[in-house]
């Protein structure tokens, strides 16, 4: 019988909230007896926006804004049914996008 893995990708704009959520998932998985690989930091995505400061002339005067998206990857190896139940009941912080994939 093949072992199953749970792959969890987390995304957030604030890395502190992301790291706290990642640690919460790791603690929950280890408490239920599963083996955890990670967290693996993935490359950050930086979106930059340049806008004119004034509504009229003076094109040389501009503001730049950026949005940084931080990402983490977790692999849970051989999860038990208790692990899956605990992860489903887990309530993470607002602003963290969670993507879960089940792999064989």
UniProtKB/Swiss-Prot annotation:
Transmembrane segments: none annotated. This is Small ribosomal subunit protein uS10. It comes from Ruegeria sp. (strain TM1040). Involved in the binding of tRNA to the ribosomes. Keywords: Ribonucleoprotein, Ribosomal protein. Part of the 30S ribosomal subunit. The keyword Endoplasmic reticulum does not apply. InterPro entries: Ribosomal_uS10, Ribosomal_uS10_dom, Ribosomal_uS10_dom_sf. One of its GO terms (cellular component) is ribosome. Signal peptide: none annotated.
């Amino acid at each position: 019988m093949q072992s199953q893995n749970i792959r969890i990708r987390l995304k957030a704009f604030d890395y502190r909230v992301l790291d706290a959520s990642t640690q919460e998932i790791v603690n929950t998985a280890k408490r239920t007896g599963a083996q955890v690989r990670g967290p693996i930091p993935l490359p950050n995505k930086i979106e930059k926006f340049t806008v004119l400061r004034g509504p009229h002339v003076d094109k040389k005067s501009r503001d730049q804004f950026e949005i940084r998206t931080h990402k983490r990857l977790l692999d849970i190896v051989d999860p038990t049914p208790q692990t899956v139940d605990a992860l489903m009941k887990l309530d993470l912080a607002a602003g963290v996008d969670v993507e879960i994939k089940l792999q064989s």
